[in-house]
Amino acid sequence: MKSIYITGYMGAGKTTIGKALSKELHMDVIDTDQKIEEKQEKEIRDIFAEEGEMAFREYESEMLRSLPVENVIITTGGGIIEREENRKWMKENGTVVYLYCDPHVIAERLREDTTRPLFQKKDIDAFVMKFELRRAYYEEAHIHIDTTNKSVKQIMDELKEKINE
């Protein structure tokens, strides 16, 4: 089976759904952000602070290409889709899943989360604007799932149905 790439904006449920799907399909799950932190030996927020977003995006592209393209679920950072080369790579090497969640719901979830570098010191309008700028890229995915106000079970049922189509 080709890899399954789970994309979506921060807070949409990528990590949670990736873990749940991993159990259902008996496949390993790899988180690109976690792998970058391990390789760079620092947290993402520190990479952003010390090296900037462009350096992080380069690490992200390198990491994406280093991962297996079969029998694995890959949960991605929210901005991985900003680079056309990344979108193309994922579409050519697996099934891309876009987890959509209303940006106002996400903002409420993340308001106090200090581990989210692009959410820090941003107002809701700027957050929603960044979300909307990325939306067309996310929508290039093979499968779209709206996670807004849904349980993990509801999301998983819908995702399994769409994967098996």
UniProtKB/Swiss-Prot annotation:
Per UniProt, the keywords (alphabetical) are: Amino-acid biosynthesis, Aromatic amino acid biosynthesis, ATP-binding, Cytoplasm, Kinase, Magnesium, Metal-binding, Nucleotide-binding, Transferase
As cofactor, the record names: Mg(2+)
State the Gene3D superfamilies in the record.
Answer: P-loop containing nucleotide triphosphate hydrolases
Per the UniProt entry, what are the Gene Ontology biological process annotations, in alphabetical order?
amino acid biosynthetic process; aromatic amino acid family biosynthetic process; chorismate biosynthetic process
Pfam families reported in the protein's UniProt record: SKI (PF01202)
In the record, what terms sit under GO molecular function?
ATP binding; magnesium ion binding; shikimate kinase activity
Q: What is its EC number?
A: 2.7.1.71
Tell me which GO cellular component terms the UniProt record holds: cytosol
| Subcellular localization | Cytoplasm
The UniProt family comment states:
Belongs to the shikimate kinase family.
What is the name listed in the Swiss-Prot or TrEMBL entry for this protein?
Shikimate kinase
